[in-house]
Amino acid sequence: MQGLNTTPVHGHTALFGVYGMLGIGLMLFSLRALGQGRRWKEWPVRYAFWTINVGLALMVLLSLLPIGLLQTWAAVEHGTWYARSAEFMQTGLTTNLRWMRAFGDTVFAAGALLLGYFVLGLVTGTSYTKEEPVKVNEFDYALPLGEIHATAAD
């Protein structure tokens, strides 16, 4: 199974699960701190999370994994050389399965665009609610950092 389409299954799911989600989480954590306690409209982040994950699952389950399993079967029956050959990869079934990946890619891209829309909204102010900023301890994050440090020193 090594070197067949099962390798991208592992690469796409594991790398995005570890580094992609970690990166998005760190970005959102940092953006939350930069927002000085202002409340977010959370629906774009929620929908972005689910569409990105559903898109990745569709990409893997509709295309990469089925092709990888077909290649594994072909490698067991005829050898790895055949499973990786153009003769096998250009059959009608594998071609259709490769095109099925577009569904998952489209859903994934919609989630990425929604996340981008949310981040752009943080810059323009449209991703914030009109509620009062969140207060932590006696300090209000809506104060500039210099005033927070000056107040803490008193």
Regions of interest found by a model, annotated:
Residues 136-138:
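Aromatic- and carboxylate-enriched substrate-binding clefts and catalytic-loop regions
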Residues 131-134:
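Peripheral terminal and linker regions in Fe-S/redox and tRNA-modifying enzymes
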Residues 7-35, 40-90, 97-127, 140-145, ...:
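Hydrophobic cores of alpha-helical transmembrane segments in multi-pass integral membrane proteins
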Residues 1-7:
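Membrane-interface interhelical connector segments
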